Protein backbone atom coordinates (compact mmCIF):
# COMPACT_ATOMS: atom_id res chain seq x y z
CA UNK A 1 0.00 0.00 0.00
CA UNK A 2 2.80 2.41 0.89
CA UNK A 3 4.47 1.65 -2.43
CA UNK A 4 1.25 2.44 -4.30
CA UNK A 5 0.86 5.73 -2.46
CA UNK A 6 4.46 6.57 -3.22
CA UNK A 7 3.99 5.87 -6.92
CA UNK A 8 0.89 8.05 -7.06
CA UNK A 9 2.64 10.83 -5.18
CA UNK A 10 5.47 11.09 -7.65
CA UNK A 11 3.21 11.01 -10.72
CA UNK A 12 3.26 14.49 -12.29
CA UNK A 13 1.20 14.73 -15.51
CA UNK A 14 2.68 16.77 -18.35
CA UNK A 15 -0.35 19.10 -18.42
CA UNK A 16 0.06 19.95 -14.75
CA UNK A 17 3.81 20.48 -15.20
CA UNK A 18 3.02 22.93 -18.00
CA UNK A 19 0.71 24.86 -15.68
CA UNK A 20 3.35 24.96 -12.94
CA UNK A 21 5.90 26.21 -15.49
CA UNK A 22 3.50 28.97 -16.58
CA UNK A 23 3.01 30.01 -12.94
CA UNK A 24 6.77 30.32 -12.46
CA UNK A 25 7.07 32.12 -15.81
CA UNK A 26 4.39 34.71 -14.98
CA UNK A 27 5.68 35.33 -11.45
CA UNK A 28 9.18 35.89 -12.86
CA UNK A 29 7.76 38.15 -15.55
CA UNK A 30 5.93 40.19 -12.88
CA UNK A 31 9.27 40.77 -11.16
CA UNK A 32 11.21 41.55 -14.36
CA UNK A 33 8.60 43.75 -16.06
CA UNK A 34 8.98 46.49 -13.46
CA UNK A 35 12.50 47.28 -14.72
CA UNK A 36 11.68 48.67 -18.22
CA UNK A 37 8.44 50.30 -16.98
CA UNK A 38 9.79 51.78 -13.72
CA UNK A 39 10.68 55.22 -15.12
CA UNK A 40 7.28 55.52 -16.85
CA UNK A 41 5.46 54.42 -13.69
CA UNK A 42 7.24 56.95 -11.48
CA UNK A 43 6.49 59.73 -13.97
CA UNK A 44 2.84 58.62 -14.12
CA UNK A 45 2.37 59.20 -10.38
CA UNK A 46 4.32 62.48 -10.45
CA UNK A 47 7.48 61.19 -8.75
CA UNK A 48 11.11 61.84 -9.71
CA UNK A 49 12.31 59.30 -12.29
CA UNK A 50 15.49 58.92 -10.22
CA UNK A 51 13.31 57.04 -7.71
CA UNK A 52 12.43 54.31 -10.20
CA UNK A 53 14.86 51.89 -8.57
CA UNK A 54 12.75 51.92 -5.40
CA UNK A 55 9.93 50.19 -7.28
CA UNK A 56 12.31 47.34 -8.10
CA UNK A 57 13.61 47.26 -4.53
CA UNK A 58 10.11 47.19 -3.01
CA UNK A 59 9.30 43.92 -4.75
CA UNK A 60 12.72 42.33 -4.34
CA UNK A 61 13.28 43.02 -0.65
CA UNK A 62 9.78 41.92 0.36
CA UNK A 63 10.19 38.77 -1.76
CA UNK A 64 13.60 38.07 -0.19
CA UNK A 65 12.22 38.31 3.35
CA UNK A 66 9.25 36.15 2.39
CA UNK A 67 11.52 33.48 0.88
CA UNK A 68 13.32 33.26 4.24
CA UNK A 69 10.08 33.01 6.21
CA UNK A 70 8.13 30.61 3.99
CA UNK A 71 9.27 27.01 4.14
CA UNK A 72 8.09 24.26 1.85
CA UNK A 73 5.71 21.81 3.50
CA UNK A 74 5.91 18.04 3.08
CA UNK A 75 2.14 17.64 2.61
CA UNK A 76 1.20 17.80 -1.07
CA UNK A 77 -2.43 18.79 -0.52
CA UNK A 78 -1.41 21.62 1.80
CA UNK A 79 1.09 22.93 -0.75
CA UNK A 80 -1.57 23.08 -3.44
CA UNK A 81 -3.94 24.99 -1.16
CA UNK A 82 -1.18 27.44 -0.26
CA UNK A 83 -0.41 27.95 -3.94
CA UNK A 84 -4.03 28.87 -4.65
CA UNK A 85 -3.96 31.41 -1.79
CA UNK A 86 -0.70 33.02 -2.96
CA UNK A 87 -1.96 33.09 -6.55
CA UNK A 88 -5.05 35.01 -5.45
CA UNK A 89 -2.83 37.46 -3.57
CA UNK A 90 -0.44 38.19 -6.43
CA UNK A 91 -3.33 38.60 -8.89
CA UNK A 92 -5.00 41.24 -6.71
CA UNK A 93 -1.75 43.04 -5.85
CA UNK A 94 -0.66 43.22 -9.51
CA UNK A 95 -4.07 44.47 -10.63
CA UNK A 96 -4.34 47.12 -7.89
CA UNK A 97 -0.91 48.45 -8.94
CA UNK A 98 -2.58 49.72 -12.12
CA UNK A 99 -5.25 51.63 -10.16
CA UNK A 100 -3.11 53.77 -7.83
CA UNK A 101 -2.06 57.36 -8.53
CA UNK A 102 0.36 57.86 -5.63
CA UNK A 103 4.00 56.75 -5.42
CA UNK A 104 3.68 55.52 -1.83
CA UNK A 105 0.62 53.45 -2.71
CA UNK A 106 2.45 52.05 -5.72
CA UNK A 107 5.39 51.05 -3.49
CA UNK A 108 2.94 49.33 -1.12
CA UNK A 109 1.37 47.39 -4.01
CA UNK A 110 4.80 46.23 -5.15
CA UNK A 111 5.66 45.16 -1.59
CA UNK A 112 2.49 43.05 -1.45
CA UNK A 113 3.23 41.64 -4.90
CA UNK A 114 6.72 40.69 -3.70
CA UNK A 115 5.33 38.95 -0.62
CA UNK A 116 2.94 36.78 -2.62
CA UNK A 117 5.39 36.31 -5.49
CA UNK A 118 8.26 35.26 -3.22
CA UNK A 119 6.06 32.79 -1.36
CA UNK A 120 4.67 31.41 -4.61
CA UNK A 121 8.14 30.72 -6.05
CA UNK A 122 9.16 28.74 -2.96
CA UNK A 123 5.93 26.75 -2.69
CA UNK A 124 5.69 26.09 -6.44
CA UNK A 125 9.24 24.73 -6.60
CA UNK A 126 8.65 22.57 -3.54
CA UNK A 127 5.36 21.30 -5.00
CA UNK A 128 7.15 20.22 -8.19
CA UNK A 129 9.81 18.39 -6.17
CA UNK A 130 7.18 16.64 -4.04
CA UNK A 131 5.23 15.55 -7.11
CA UNK A 132 8.29 14.33 -9.04
CA UNK A 133 10.02 10.99 -8.75
CA UNK A 134 13.76 10.69 -8.23
CA UNK A 135 14.29 10.03 -11.93
CA UNK A 136 12.37 13.20 -12.95
CA UNK A 137 13.16 15.53 -10.06
CA UNK A 138 16.26 17.10 -11.59
CA UNK A 139 14.67 17.47 -15.03
CA UNK A 140 11.45 19.03 -13.71
CA UNK A 141 13.38 21.41 -11.46
CA UNK A 142 15.60 22.50 -14.36
CA UNK A 143 12.56 23.07 -16.56
CA UNK A 144 10.96 25.22 -13.86
CA UNK A 145 14.12 27.29 -13.31
CA UNK A 146 14.48 27.92 -17.06
CA UNK A 147 11.29 30.00 -16.95
CA UNK A 148 13.20 33.09 -15.74
CA UNK A 149 15.50 33.55 -18.78
CA UNK A 150 12.52 32.73 -20.99
CA UNK A 151 10.51 35.48 -19.26
CA UNK A 152 13.36 37.89 -19.99
CA UNK A 153 13.76 36.81 -23.62
CA UNK A 154 10.09 36.48 -24.59
CA UNK A 155 7.83 37.89 -21.88
CA UNK A 156 9.40 41.32 -21.33
CA UNK A 157 9.62 42.23 -25.06
CA UNK A 158 6.01 41.14 -25.59
CA UNK A 159 4.83 43.27 -22.66
CA UNK A 160 6.74 46.28 -23.99
CA UNK A 161 5.15 45.86 -27.42
CA UNK A 162 1.73 45.26 -25.87
CA UNK A 163 2.00 48.46 -23.85
CA UNK A 164 3.45 50.37 -26.84
CA UNK A 165 6.19 51.53 -24.50
CA UNK A 166 3.96 53.94 -22.56
CA UNK A 167 0.74 52.30 -21.34
CA UNK A 168 2.36 50.29 -18.54
CA UNK A 169 -1.04 49.66 -16.92
CA UNK A 170 -2.12 47.52 -19.86
CA UNK A 171 0.97 45.34 -19.39
CA UNK A 172 0.26 44.68 -15.70
CA UNK A 173 -3.45 44.17 -16.34
CA UNK A 174 -2.50 41.56 -18.92
CA UNK A 175 -0.24 39.93 -16.32
CA UNK A 176 -2.99 39.76 -13.71
CA UNK A 177 -5.48 38.30 -16.19
CA UNK A 178 -2.92 35.72 -17.34
CA UNK A 179 -2.26 34.71 -13.73
CA UNK A 180 -6.01 34.40 -13.17
CA UNK A 181 -6.44 32.09 -16.17
CA UNK A 182 -3.51 29.90 -15.11
CA UNK A 183 -4.92 29.76 -11.56
CA UNK A 184 -8.25 28.52 -12.93
CA UNK A 185 -6.42 25.81 -14.88
CA UNK A 186 -4.40 24.85 -11.81
CA UNK A 187 -7.57 24.63 -9.71
CA UNK A 188 -9.25 22.61 -12.45
CA UNK A 189 -6.51 19.96 -12.42
CA UNK A 190 -7.53 19.06 -8.88
CA UNK A 191 -11.24 19.85 -9.18
CA UNK A 192 -12.02 17.94 -12.35
CA UNK A 193 -8.96 15.73 -12.77
CA UNK A 194 -8.17 12.35 -11.31
CA UNK A 195 -8.03 13.12 -7.61
CA UNK A 196 -6.12 10.00 -6.69
CA UNK A 197 -3.12 11.55 -8.46
CA UNK A 198 -2.74 14.11 -5.67
CA UNK A 199 -3.14 12.18 -2.41
CA UNK A 200 -3.05 13.83 0.96
CA UNK A 201 0.25 12.27 1.95
CA UNK A 202 3.36 13.58 3.64
CA UNK A 203 6.83 13.11 2.23
CA UNK A 204 9.53 11.90 4.59
CA UNK A 205 11.62 14.53 6.31
CA UNK A 206 15.33 14.78 5.57
CA UNK A 207 18.23 15.94 7.69
CA UNK A 208 18.24 19.62 6.76
CA UNK A 209 21.09 22.11 6.99
CA UNK A 210 19.55 24.75 9.27
CA UNK A 211 20.21 28.48 9.50
CA UNK A 212 22.12 27.94 12.76
CA UNK A 213 24.35 25.45 10.94
CA UNK A 214 24.91 28.00 8.18
CA UNK A 215 25.98 30.65 10.70
CA UNK A 216 28.71 28.32 11.95
CA UNK A 217 29.85 27.25 8.48
CA UNK A 218 32.59 29.30 6.85
CA UNK A 219 31.88 27.68 3.49
CA UNK A 220 28.21 28.64 3.66
CA UNK A 221 29.10 32.24 4.52
CA UNK A 222 31.48 32.45 1.57
CA UNK A 223 28.91 30.94 -0.80
CA UNK A 224 26.26 33.43 0.29
CA UNK A 225 28.69 36.38 0.06
CA UNK A 226 29.88 35.39 -3.40
CA UNK A 227 26.38 34.82 -4.78
CA UNK A 228 25.18 38.10 -3.23
CA UNK A 229 28.09 40.12 -4.67
CA UNK A 230 27.56 38.68 -8.15
CA UNK A 231 23.83 39.45 -8.23
CA UNK A 232 24.29 42.86 -6.57
CA UNK A 233 26.88 43.87 -9.18
CA UNK A 234 24.45 42.88 -11.91
CA UNK A 235 21.27 44.55 -10.69
CA UNK A 236 22.88 47.76 -9.45
CA UNK A 237 23.31 48.47 -13.16
CA UNK A 238 20.56 46.51 -14.91
CA UNK A 239 17.81 48.36 -13.00
CA UNK A 240 19.11 51.73 -14.26
CA UNK A 241 20.35 50.80 -17.74
CA UNK A 242 16.85 50.78 -19.33
CA UNK A 243 16.01 53.95 -17.36
CA UNK A 244 19.03 55.67 -18.90
CA UNK A 245 18.05 54.42 -22.36
CA UNK A 246 14.51 55.75 -21.94
CA UNK A 247 15.10 59.05 -20.13
CA UNK A 248 18.48 60.21 -21.46
CA UNK A 249 18.51 58.71 -24.97
CA UNK A 250 14.78 58.34 -25.72
CA UNK A 251 14.97 54.75 -26.95
CA UNK A 252 11.96 53.52 -28.92
CA UNK A 253 9.77 50.72 -27.49
CA UNK A 254 10.62 48.48 -30.45
CA UNK A 255 14.38 48.86 -29.97
CA UNK A 256 14.07 48.30 -26.21
CA UNK A 257 12.08 45.11 -26.77
CA UNK A 258 14.74 43.93 -29.24
CA UNK A 259 17.39 44.58 -26.56
CA UNK A 260 15.55 42.36 -24.09
CA UNK A 261 15.00 39.70 -26.75
CA UNK A 262 18.68 39.61 -27.72
CA UNK A 263 19.74 39.67 -24.06
CA UNK A 264 17.49 36.77 -23.14
CA UNK A 265 18.46 34.68 -26.16
CA UNK A 266 22.15 35.42 -25.61
CA UNK A 267 21.96 34.53 -21.92
CA UNK A 268 20.06 31.33 -22.71
CA UNK A 269 22.65 30.33 -25.34
CA UNK A 270 25.51 31.06 -22.94
CA UNK A 271 23.83 28.96 -20.26
CA UNK A 272 23.43 26.05 -22.68
CA UNK A 273 27.06 26.29 -23.82
CA UNK A 274 28.43 26.40 -20.29
CA UNK A 275 26.27 23.45 -19.24
CA UNK A 276 27.87 21.33 -21.96
CA UNK A 277 31.49 22.20 -21.17
CA UNK A 278 33.85 20.97 -18.47
CA UNK A 279 36.30 23.40 -16.92
CA UNK A 280 38.81 23.10 -14.11
CA UNK A 281 39.00 25.49 -11.17
CA UNK A 282 41.65 27.70 -12.77
CA UNK A 283 39.68 28.15 -15.98
CA UNK A 284 36.51 28.93 -14.02
CA UNK A 285 38.33 31.66 -12.09
CA UNK A 286 39.71 33.11 -15.32
CA UNK A 287 36.25 33.06 -16.91
CA UNK A 288 34.75 34.90 -13.91
CA UNK A 289 37.50 37.54 -14.13
CA UNK A 290 37.02 38.07 -17.89
CA UNK A 291 33.24 38.32 -17.54
CA UNK A 292 33.67 40.87 -14.71
CA UNK A 293 35.98 42.99 -16.87
CA UNK A 294 33.47 42.77 -19.72
CA UNK A 295 30.78 44.05 -17.34
CA UNK A 296 32.88 47.11 -16.47
CA UNK A 297 33.63 47.85 -20.15
CA UNK A 298 29.98 47.60 -21.23
CA UNK A 299 28.77 49.76 -18.32
CA UNK A 300 31.25 52.57 -18.96
CA UNK A 301 30.81 52.51 -22.74
CA UNK A 302 27.02 52.21 -22.56
CA UNK A 303 26.46 55.05 -20.09
CA UNK A 304 29.02 57.40 -21.67
CA UNK A 305 27.97 57.18 -25.32
CA UNK A 306 25.38 59.50 -26.85
CA UNK A 307 24.38 56.95 -29.48
CA UNK A 308 21.23 55.05 -28.60
CA UNK A 309 22.28 52.18 -30.89
CA UNK A 310 25.68 51.72 -29.21
CA UNK A 311 24.12 52.03 -25.75
CA UNK A 312 21.54 49.40 -26.70
CA UNK A 313 24.27 46.99 -27.80
CA UNK A 314 26.18 47.64 -24.56
CA UNK A 315 23.02 46.92 -22.54
CA UNK A 316 22.40 43.62 -24.33
CA UNK A 317 26.01 42.50 -23.93
CA UNK A 318 25.99 43.49 -20.25
CA UNK A 319 22.92 41.34 -19.55
CA UNK A 320 24.50 38.36 -21.31
CA UNK A 321 27.91 38.53 -19.57
CA UNK A 322 26.48 39.34 -16.13
CA UNK A 323 23.87 36.56 -16.36
CA UNK A 324 26.53 34.09 -17.47
CA UNK A 325 28.82 35.10 -14.61
CA UNK A 326 26.07 34.60 -12.04
CA UNK A 327 25.18 31.21 -13.51
CA UNK A 328 28.80 30.03 -13.49
CA UNK A 329 29.31 31.14 -9.89
CA UNK A 330 26.11 29.63 -8.50
CA UNK A 331 26.60 26.38 -10.42
CA UNK A 332 30.20 25.97 -9.25
CA UNK A 333 29.21 26.74 -5.65
CA UNK A 334 26.32 24.29 -5.61
CA UNK A 335 28.33 21.49 -7.20
CA UNK A 336 31.29 21.95 -4.86
CA UNK A 337 29.30 21.93 -1.60
CA UNK A 338 28.51 18.85 0.52
CA UNK A 339 24.97 17.50 0.15
CA UNK A 340 23.43 19.17 3.23
CA UNK A 341 25.00 22.58 2.54
CA UNK A 342 24.08 22.26 -1.12
CA UNK A 343 20.39 21.87 -0.25
CA UNK A 344 20.59 24.92 2.01
CA UNK A 345 22.15 27.08 -0.71
CA UNK A 346 19.55 25.98 -3.26
CA UNK A 347 16.72 26.92 -0.88
CA UNK A 348 18.41 30.19 0.13
CA UNK A 349 19.23 31.21 -3.44
CA UNK A 350 15.83 32.81 -4.10
CA UNK A 351 16.14 34.93 -0.98
CA UNK A 352 19.74 35.92 -1.80
CA UNK A 353 18.73 36.84 -5.34
CA UNK A 354 15.74 38.96 -4.33
CA UNK A 355 17.70 40.69 -1.55
CA UNK A 356 20.60 41.50 -3.88
CA UNK A 357 18.20 42.81 -6.53
CA UNK A 358 16.47 44.98 -3.93
CA UNK A 359 19.69 46.39 -2.52
CA UNK A 360 21.03 46.95 -6.04
CA UNK A 361 17.92 48.85 -7.10
CA UNK A 362 17.93 50.97 -3.95
CA UNK A 363 21.67 51.68 -4.20
CA UNK A 364 21.42 52.71 -7.84
CA UNK A 365 18.56 55.11 -7.06
CA UNK A 366 20.48 56.66 -4.16
CA UNK A 367 23.46 57.54 -6.39
CA UNK A 368 21.43 58.73 -9.40
CA UNK A 369 20.61 62.44 -9.64
CA UNK A 370 18.31 64.54 -11.81
CA UNK A 371 19.74 67.29 -14.02
CA UNK A 372 18.12 70.60 -14.87
CA UNK A 373 17.43 69.41 -18.43
CA UNK A 374 15.25 66.54 -17.11
CA UNK A 375 17.94 63.93 -17.79
CA UNK A 376 19.69 61.81 -15.16
CA UNK A 377 23.30 61.83 -13.94
CA UNK A 378 24.67 58.30 -13.50
CA UNK A 379 28.33 59.25 -12.91
CA UNK A 380 28.56 57.96 -9.29
CA UNK A 381 26.89 54.71 -10.35
CA UNK A 382 29.65 54.00 -12.89
CA UNK A 383 32.36 54.01 -10.21
CA UNK A 384 30.34 51.99 -7.70
CA UNK A 385 29.19 49.40 -10.25
CA UNK A 386 32.76 48.92 -11.50
CA UNK A 387 33.97 48.24 -7.96
CA UNK A 388 31.09 45.83 -7.34
CA UNK A 389 31.77 43.94 -10.58
CA UNK A 390 35.48 43.53 -9.79
CA UNK A 391 34.85 42.57 -6.15
CA UNK A 392 33.37 39.21 -7.16
CA UNK A 393 36.54 37.72 -8.76
CA UNK A 394 38.57 39.14 -5.86
CA UNK A 395 36.37 37.28 -3.36
CA UNK A 396 36.58 34.13 -5.50
CA UNK A 397 40.41 34.13 -5.65
CA UNK A 398 40.69 35.05 -1.96
CA UNK A 399 38.56 32.08 -0.94
CA UNK A 400 40.48 29.67 -3.19
CA UNK A 401 43.78 30.78 -1.65
CA UNK A 402 42.38 30.16 1.83
What kind of feature is each model-predicted range?
Residues 164-176, 366-389:
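A membrane-interface helix-boundary motif in multi-pass transporters
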Residues 134-136, 142-191:
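Helix-loop-helix hairpin linking two adjacent transmembrane segments in secondary transporters
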Residues 2-11, 191-224:
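Juxtamembrane intracellular "pre-TM" segments in multi-pass secondary transporters
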Residues 65-101:
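Conserved MFS/SLC helix-loop-helix module at the cytosolic interface between two early adjacent transmembrane helices
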Residues 339-372:
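A late C-terminal transmembrane helix in Major Facilitator Superfamily
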Residues 103, 109-148:
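Cytoplasmic helix-loop-helix junction between adjacent transmembrane helices
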Residues 34-35, 219-260:
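Extracytoplasmic gate region of multi-pass secondary transporters
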Residues 284-329:
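C-terminal transmembrane helical hairpin of 12-TM major facilitator-type secondary transporters
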Amino acid sequence: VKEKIKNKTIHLPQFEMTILFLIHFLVGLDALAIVPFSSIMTSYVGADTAWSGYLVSAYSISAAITCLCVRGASNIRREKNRMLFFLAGIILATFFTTLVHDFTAMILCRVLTGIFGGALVVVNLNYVILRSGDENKKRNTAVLMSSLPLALAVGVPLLILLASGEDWRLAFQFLSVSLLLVSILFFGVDRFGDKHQIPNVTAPNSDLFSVSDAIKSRTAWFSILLAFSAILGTFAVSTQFPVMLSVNLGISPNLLSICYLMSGVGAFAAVQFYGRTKANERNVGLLILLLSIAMVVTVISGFQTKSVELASIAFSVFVVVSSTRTLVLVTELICSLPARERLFLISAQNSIQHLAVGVGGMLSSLVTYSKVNSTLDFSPLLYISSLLALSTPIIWYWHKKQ
